[in-house]
Amino acid sequence: MCDDDVAALVVDNGSGMVKAGFAGDDAPRAVFPSIVGRPRHQGVMVGMGQKDSYVGDEAQSKRGILTLKYPIEHGIVTNWDDMEKIWHHTFYNELRVAPEEHPVLLTEAPLNPKANREKMTQIMFETFNSPAMYVAIQAVLSLYASGRTTGIVFDSGDGVSHTVPIYEGYALPHAIIRLDLAGRDLTDYLMKILTERGYSFTTTAEREIVRDIKEKLCYVALDFEQEMQTAASSSSLEKSYELPDGQVITIGNERFRASETLFQPSFIGMESAGIHETCYNRIMKCDVDIRKDLYVNTVLSGGSTMFPGIADRMQKEISALAPPTMKIKIIAPPERKYSVWIGGSILASLSTFQQMWISKQEYDESGPSIVHRKCF
């Protein structure tokens, strides 16, 4: 199948960031925004070598003159031409490899439409001439990265969150739930509540500033009401942040109000249950015999679970819902921002996995639908 000396490529395509690197590494080599930008205006300078599109960090840095598009919305690829550009950029510019020489492991959102997996497979074999490929479910990889094969994963990135119960390595599809509430919504909500304080953030460029404020200063309160009272009566929770132009702004209760949306989606007008309740409901959807294994293996994954205090709060909230004698353990690995990628790196370097790859030959014989038979 694949020679031992050729490292497999692992590419985790998130709604917000692409994480890419080589199987066997402990962290991705390349992490860049999943964006494709096209010039808004006609170029006027002769010989400037105008490009018709920019990808990732370059698009981000030139965002003033570009229209930015995210080809992955809510975890699912919606624009295949742009997606191809992102993969091209990943292989040739970021990793600097020839894709026809390396097997590639891609990740997909749970409940990804069948046609999407087929399209991914087709592009890898027909556009990039991959020798072999595989598509793995993101949440399952996060669980592998934590050294488990059974557990319930709450995976929350920039565009989508999923709660996925997994038993002995298999995701239980009837109990999976997707929640379109994730990092981007928290950033938007933080923009809104900062406006109430008198700071105006409106453009896409300013949204990046607010995202940075969120990542640096926000946290999850153990007791929201209590924290609101503390914030009202003293300035102990206030922190200052310097904007790129040197202006300094102060933020107080916004630090935990933004992240509280995960537990109370009604803050942004969503009629959904909070993440603690969702996890509990999904466990209850599973067979009664495996529930206690899920309670003690509740794994957090993805960038939007990086808020300080989130694990303690989950522990407290789920304990309140679960039977009183039930042992509950929330696992929040420090590297959870990249745990999907790390799980992919582990999986693709296992000797037992090598027969799982879909080879070019198998693809030529069966066509794109082979992905449903070999990847589950």
Swiss-Prot record:
Q: Which PROSITE patterns match?
A: ACTINS_1, ACTINS_2, ACTINS_ACT_LIKE
Broadest EC class assigned to this enzyme? hydrolase
Mind telling me which residues form the propeptide?
1-2
Query: Where does this protein reside within or beyond the cell?
Result: Cytoplasm; Cytoplasm, Cytoskeleton
Which keywords are on file for this protein? Acetylation, ATP-binding, Cytoplasm, Cytoskeleton, Hydrolase, Nucleotide-binding
Quote the function comment for this protein: Actins are highly conserved proteins that are involved in various types of cell motility and are ubiquitously expressed in all eukaryotic cells.
What name appears for this protein in its UniProt entry?
Actin, cytoskeletal 3A
The major lineage groups are: Eukaryota, Metazoa, Echinodermata, Eleutherozoa, Echinozoa
